[in-house]
Amino acid sequence: RRSSDLTPLISMVGVTGSMGPFFCEFTLNGDLLPPQYPATYTHELAHLLGITSEAEANFYAYQVCTRSVNKEIRFSGYFSILGHVLANARQLMTEEEYKKLFGSIRPEIIELARKDQEYWMAKYSPLIGDIQDWIYDLYLKGNKIESGRKNYSEVIGLLISYNEWKKESNK
């Protein structure tokens, strides 16, 4: 693992890490913030270990990080899926239910997420980012990830299935 020499460019397109399949090496964006580093590292490590699905790599990162004895690493695991949870909840819940869920999140976590988004948006180029999104969506679909870039958020289905499996296993 190493930081990318192309950090400014990959920050412009919103990429935090990448896996180079030809050299079996992954790189991390040098602009990563401390709470993002562990989850991004384990996500890319999952790809190195052979997991191609972005949802499964997110699930792997979540599982590894949230089981750590280090509280910063655990936090990274939880924080890494917050956006996916909220995006899915907004689509599935009524406005009242969503507001209740959002209100249950500690204010300092919401503030950190807001600052995180501002940090990355200041580096992001919409034109270059849109082109990269389109190309990457085609790349994923060409590699049998039918949902393309939407696959990242499919981690929520994996988490729900895992929690249901755990409940059944503990009966």
Regions found by a protein language model. Name each.
Residues 59-112:
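Active-site/pore-lining binding-face segments in mid-to-C-terminal subdomains
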Residues 15-20:
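Helix-hairpin-helix/helix-loop-helix acidic hairpins
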Residues 8-10:
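Phosphate/adenylate-binding glycine loop and adjacent helical scaffold
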Residues 27-31, 44-49, 71-72:
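Second-shell loop/turn segments in exported
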Residues 39-51, 55-58, 62-63:
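Active-site recognition of the HExxH zinc-binding catalytic motif
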